[in-house]
Amino acid sequence: MSRFLVLDSGPLGLLTHPQRNADVVAITEWLSRCLLSGHRVIIPAIIYYELKRELLRAGKSFSVARLEAFASRTPGRYLPLSDEALQLAAELWAKARQQGRPTADAKDLDVDVILAAQALSFESAPSDVVIATSNAKHLSQFVTAQNWSEILP
């Protein structure tokens, strides 16, 4: 079954890393297998922003170029942030706090909640969408999220 793999900043950061260390090789091979299996890889706007701002701050222009190229290589890979997703994120954020399960400090933007909302408002059925991450803890209270290395292509 093909799925939509929504990338979190950890895996996306590895994919844009210029050095070929063991983690970069592993995720690059994983991505190739996923694409060959028919999965669609999605880069949500909030994660693009989160990663790009840090790469710019650190002066990593080569990684910025890799990120931009990867995001634009396939039509439909970049998922813009919609009003619908922002509305849903506000509702998820409030509900998590009301239930005593916040995912970030009250003053933080809370990228995880916005990412979850982007995944939930995606065009496909929720069962076809999984967030590929390095830490599924906070995300999994809202949406299907798995460590990228545990997602079978």
Where are the predicted features?
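Acidic, metal-associated active-site segment
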Residues: 51, 107-129
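A generic structural signal for short hydrophobic patches within well-formed alpha-helices
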Residues: 12, 48-51, 86, 139
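Short loop/helix-cap segments at secondary-structure boundaries that form the rim of catalytic
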Residues: 138-144
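Acidic catalytic patch
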Residues: 75-101
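Short, well-structured N-terminal submotif of metal-dependent ribonuclease cores
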Residues: 1-43, 54-71
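Alpha-helix termini
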Residues: 32-37, 96-101, 120-129, 147
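Short acidic-hydrophobic, aromatic-tinged amphipathic segments that line or gate anion-handling sites
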Residues: 76-81, 147-153
